[in-house]
Amino acid sequence: MNPCRGICSPLPRLSAIRPKTNAVHFLRERRSVLRADDRVRTGDLNLGKVPRYQLRYVREVAKSIVGEAIAPKWECNDYRYLVTSSQNAPIFWMNGRLATGHSQSSNDPACLEDGGFWAVSTTFEGDFRAAKFDHVIEAPFPQTPWEKISGTWSSSFNESQYIAYVNKVKEHVAQGWVYQVNACREISIDVHVENLRGLFSLILEGNPAPWACYFQAPGIDIASASPELFLKREGKRVRTSPIKGTAPAGTVDFGMKDKAENVMIVDLMRNDLGQICKSGSVTVPRLLSTEVHPGLVHLVSDIEGELKDETTWAEIFTRLSPPGSISGAPKSSAISVIKDNEGKRGAYCGALGWVQGDQCELSVAIRIFFKDDKLRFGTGAGITWASVPNDEWEETQLKARRLVSLAGGVL
């Protein structure tokens, strides 16, 4: 496999490279810079005498970054391309931003105030996880192969159990306890892979999404095909774009149930933004717009506002989390129903993306694969009084079907 695929341009002929040594190149030089155990010196790279077994992978980083260790005792002091000894090093990618050089991890959103580039994953339950990366460039995601999974995915609810859950939510609606609940289930399968990079490569090819993201750091491995924006920040301006309403591709118009569901969440998100934005600044510039995505269509709205002075990142996450579209309305009551009926969602239905200074792009962490002891994927549907239980089950299948087909296995 070409270790530079997706980062470097086509490589020249490498007859001088000995067997078992992967080629590492400089685009500017257009020539080999590594030969087995030879001392390596170029204008951009000084690795000293590095054993060849450590020279396996290459990733681009900003020139003049100093001092990232590639293995014990060996350091780059001035480089354009960094040689790494493992393809399992922390990495983050979203919308063309490739971040490497993991230097710090934190569970405190106050860390975001330092102005550095932080990849962020929050859980539905409110846990905050962030990894700081020192090197950020514009680059495509490094392509990695994926061997498709075999076997059958297990679901936290089978069809009859999920339908019973939907009916229970409808009872809560009838009692006036909630107006809407996003009822979810988790599917999982045993898998033995080092990471999900190869799966994310397939996602980018087979299910491109506006907020697709890959985040790998200690304790985190998430491959996302999220279609939904949780929060975009540019200075004082913030925007959220909740999705409520899903239908098969080719659907021309959504019914009243989907439209009512969307408007409920728009109202909820207006209230959430109102807690951190200046009075009178919250607006809805787009309402009930149809967006086309691979295999389905969504109903989307935009809510915008201007942040109050001195608003911190900790306040933003506290006031807005979890996202309204994947909890329900009223949010506190919906969360109570979810906790009573579902297991822990974890990274699914949290927030996922990056923060740097007063800028951010955070997606709603839906359509994500995440890995711990198993490979997991969440899917759900918004339940209102007008919900037809069998239709809601089919919606969860629709959301999972295309992506699971990329990963492999039987849904």
Task: Describe the role of every protein-language-model region.
Residues 1-20, 25, 32, 62-79:
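N-terminal, intrinsically disordered charge-dense segments
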Residues 74-411:
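Extended alpha-helical targeting/anchoring segments
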